[in-house]
UniProtKB/Swiss-Prot annotation:
Entry keywords, A to Z: Glycoprotein, Membrane, Transmembrane, Transmembrane helix
Bias (Low complexity): 50-72, 193-213
Protein name: Putative uncharacterized protein DDB_G0274369
First and last residue of the signal peptide: none
Localization per record: Membrane
Location (main, coarse): membrane
The organism's taxonomic lineage, starting at the top: Eukaryota, Amoebozoa, Evosea, Eumycetozoa, Dictyostelia
Stretches the record annotates as Disordered: 41-73, 193-219
Membrane topology: Single-pass membrane protein
Transmembrane segments: 131-151
Organism the protein comes from: Dictyostelium discoideum
Length: 352
């Protein structure tokens, strides 16, 4: 296999041997062709190189643009991935209520041994103890934290008890002050009431003394005290001591007088008045032959004249009865034998 130069170009020749072509210098035309072919080959190589370089120069901006496009695509893909993860993270943390609650709880704080700790710091302590000391360290830290919270509860309860005791003491003091004021007021009221009662007692005693010092007639005594009458035997002054009045011939006496006995003793009008009015002073008791002088009788009658005049109008009906004349007769104070001549209804029974 050999090479031939035909028209300035190299052509393979299968018929010829592989020996290098021989160039003869037999003719001048061949020499010129040979020279042209050599020059054309060198020019061809140069032109080819220049064309390749020019093509490379032309293709470089395209390659640069392609590289830029590839780089921009890679950047866009990375940004898309970042945006996706950011969006997903924002959805998980900000829009999920459970995540929001978790974040808020991590920001909370608790008192442990009277010191405030945030939960995120406590969580970091637990995680670090787990990493360093493993499970035993985690259990010890949790136990210490629990004891700290228990200590805080005890201290808070003690503070509450002290506050309650202080409030109770304050309320008791106020109640004692109120009770003392009430006692003072009650004592003042009691003293005022006692003074008023004493004044009323004094006034009542004075009125009673005035009423007791007032002299009432036998008619007034009998009407004011609603006296009932009872029969009593009386001794006659003219007859002997053994001669007594019969049961029908009796005198009217009052049951209210404690000094009157059912024996042969007559009572003076002054003693009857004093016994009915419950006075302490008493007059001497005389027997039935009690007599009064004319001056004493006049004075005694003058004492009753004024008071008897006040009851004249009210006593008009009673004056008509014989018993009234019997009881109000002045002869009753002179002798007892004249009383026996009348019964309680005014009927004349006869004389001894």
């Amino acid at each position: 296999m050999g090479l031939k130069i035909v028209d300035g170009s190299i052509v393979h020749d299968n018929l010829t041997s592989s020996s290098p072509p021989s160039v003869t210098n037999s003719s001048p035309l061949l020499n010129t062709k040979r020279r042209n072919s050599i020059t054309s080959l060198s020019d061809y190589k140069k032109n080819k190189d220049t064309l390749n370089n020019s093509n490379n120069n032309i293709n470089q901006p395209f390659e640069n643009s392609n590289n830029f496009n590839n780089n921009s695509k890679e950047i866009k893909n990375e940004n898309k991935i970042k945006n996706f993860f950011q969006h997903l993270f924002s959805i998980l943390l900000l829009k999920n209520p459970t995540m929001i609650q978790i974040i808020e709880t991590l920001e909370l704080s608790t008192n442990i041994y009277n010191i405030q700790f945030k939960l995120k710091y406590l969580l970091a302590i637990c995680v670090s103890s787990q990493i360093i000391f493993k499970s035993s360290g985690l259990l010890i830290t949790l136990l210490v934290l629990y004891l700290g919270t228990f200590f805080n509860k005890i201290s808070i309860n003690n503070k509450d008890k002290n506050k309650n005791n202080n409030t109770i003491d304050y309320s008791l003091k106020n109640n004692n002050i109120d009770t003392s004021l009430i006692k003072d007021i009650n004592n003042s009221v009691i003293s005022n009431n006692s003074s008023n009662s004493n004044n009323n007692n004094i006034n009542n005693s004075n009125n009673n003394n005035n009423n007791n010092n007032r002299i009432l007639s036998p008619n007034q005594l009998s009407k004011s005290s609603n006296v009932e009458y009872n029969k009593c035997k009386c001794k006659s002054p003219t007859t002997s001591s053994n001669n007594y009045l019969s049961s029908s011939q009796s005198r009217v006496q009052t049951l209210s007088s404690p000094n009157i006995s059912p024996c042969n003793i007559c009572v003076s009008p002054n003693l009857l008045y004093n016994s009915l009015s419950s006075l302490s002073s008493s007059l001497p008791i005389n027997s039935c032959n009690y007599s009064m002088s004319e001056q004493e009788g006049d004075e005694f009658e003058s004492n009753f004249d004024f008071e008897d005049s006040q009851y004249e109008e009210s006593d008009e009906e009673d004056n008509s009865s014989p018993a009234f004349h019997l009881y109000s007769s002045p002869n009753l104070r002179v002798a007892c034998n004249k009383i026996s001549t009348f019964s309680p209804n005014g009927r004349k029974l006869g004389t001894n």
